[in-house]
Amino acid sequence: MIYAGILAGGIGSRMGNVPLPKQFLDIDNKPILIHTIEKFILVSEFNEIIIATPAQWISHTQDILKKYNITDQRVKVVAGGTDRNETIMNIIDHIRNTQGINDDDVIVTHDAVRPFLTQRIIKENIEVAAKYGAVDTVIEAIDTIVMSKDKQNIHSIPVRNEMYQGQTPQSFNIKLLQDSYRALSSAQKEILSDACKIIVESGHAVKLVRGELYNIKVTTPYDLKVANAIIQGDIADD
C-alpha cells in the first residue's frame, strides 16, 4: 500500500507574532495546509493520506477540513510528535495499528507548508521509493555553500556542483525507515535534521528526484509574501 504522511506538527516560531501555527495561515484566502492536502488528494495511488498535527490542534484541523469540503475518506488526522522524525513514527504507528505494515508499503512524507509540489514530484517519489527504498526531492544549489563551525569563520567551501538543496517529499519503504530509525542511538536521533539522514546513517542508498524552485517551504513572513506571489502569478505547475 502507498501512504502520504503530511507533517503539520510545527508551531511556526519563525513566522513571528501570528495567531496560528504557520500551516493554518492563509495564502490566497485558503490555509496552507488545505492547499497541500488538495495536491495529494489528486493522486489516486494513495491508500491513505495522514495528516500529523499537534494534539491541541487536531480539532482545528478537522474543522478546516470540513470548512473547505475535504471529504475524501482517505484523509486521516493523527497527533504529531515532539520533532519531525517522531511525527513520522507516529504516522507509521497509526498505519501499523490500523492496517498493518507489509514489506512493500511506501510512505511519502511531506512538509505541510510546501503547498506547491507537483503531481510529477509526487509520482516520481512513489515510483523511486517503491523501486529503491528511499528517495529525497532536491534542487541543484545555485549559491555557493560555505560551512562554519563557529558562526564567525569559514571552515570549508564544498564544490557547488556537488551540492543540492533538500526539499520534500522524502519517501521510503516503511519497514526500511522503521528498522533504520530503531537502530540509531539516542545521540544519533538528537542530531537528525530530516528523515533521509536516518537512511544515510544506516548505510542504505537514498536516490534523488528533481524538485522545483517554487516548491518552497513557507516558514517566515517573507515566504508568505512569496507564496502569495506564486499563486497570483500562476507560477507553479499543477
From Swiss-Prot:
GO MF assignments: 2-C-methyl-D-erythritol 4-phosphate cytidylyltransferase activity; D-ribitol-5-phosphate cytidylyltransferase activity
Disulfide bridge positions per record: none
CDD domains noted in UniProt: CDP-ME_synthetase
Domain of life: Bacteria
EC number: 2.7.7.40
Site (Positions ribitol 5-phosphate for the nucleophilic attack): 160, 217
Biological process, per Gene Ontology: cell wall organization; isoprenoid biosynthetic process; poly(ribitol phosphate) teichoic acid biosynthetic process
Reactions the enzyme catalyzes: D-ribitol 5-phosphate + CTP + H(+) = CDP-L-ribitol + diphosphate
PANTHER family per record: 2-C-METHYL-D-ERYTHRITOL 4-PHOSPHATE CYTIDYLYLTRANSFERASE, CHLOROPLASTIC, RIBITOL-5-PHOSPHATE CYTIDYLYLTRANSFERASE
Protein name: Ribitol-5-phosphate cytidylyltransferase 2
